[in-house]
């Protein structure tokens, strides 16, 4: 996936994966893993990378990643 996506496209991608289980407005760690493996495969170099990335993105510590938290990752990789 190209990092150059419109905000609407990014929101659609986020919602597609977030709706798989639990809260449709939040990504669980498994949903984030699936999204990254599919859309940004070069970001995941191993299991520790996912854990570190999830911890970094989950700013409020609720165990899930909101769209706002996800946007931090998108901004970081599009620079």
UniProtKB/Swiss-Prot annotation:
Q: Does the keyword Metal-binding apply?
A: yes
Q: Does the keyword Heme apply?
A: no
Give the matching InterPro entries: EF-hand-dom_pair, EF_Hand_1_Ca_BS, EF_hand_dom, S100/CaBP7/8-like_CS, S100_Ca-bd_sub
- Lineage, broadest ranks: Eukaryota, Metazoa, Chordata, Craniata, Vertebrata
List every position bearing N-acetylserine: 2
The entry's Ca(2+) 2-binding residues are 58, 60, 62, 64, 69
Name of the protein in its database record: Protein S100-G
PTM annotation (Phosphoserine): residues: 42
């Amino acid at each position: 996936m190209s990092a150059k996506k419109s905000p609407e496209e990014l929101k659609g991608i986020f919602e597609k994966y977030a709706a798989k289980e639990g809260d449709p407005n939040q990504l669980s760690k498994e949903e984030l893993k699936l999204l990254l493996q599919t859309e940004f495969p070069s970001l995941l170099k191993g299991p520790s990378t996912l854990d570190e990335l999830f911890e970094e993105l989950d700013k409020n510590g609720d165990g899930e990643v909101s769209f706002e938290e996800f946007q931090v990752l998108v901004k970081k990789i599009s620079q």
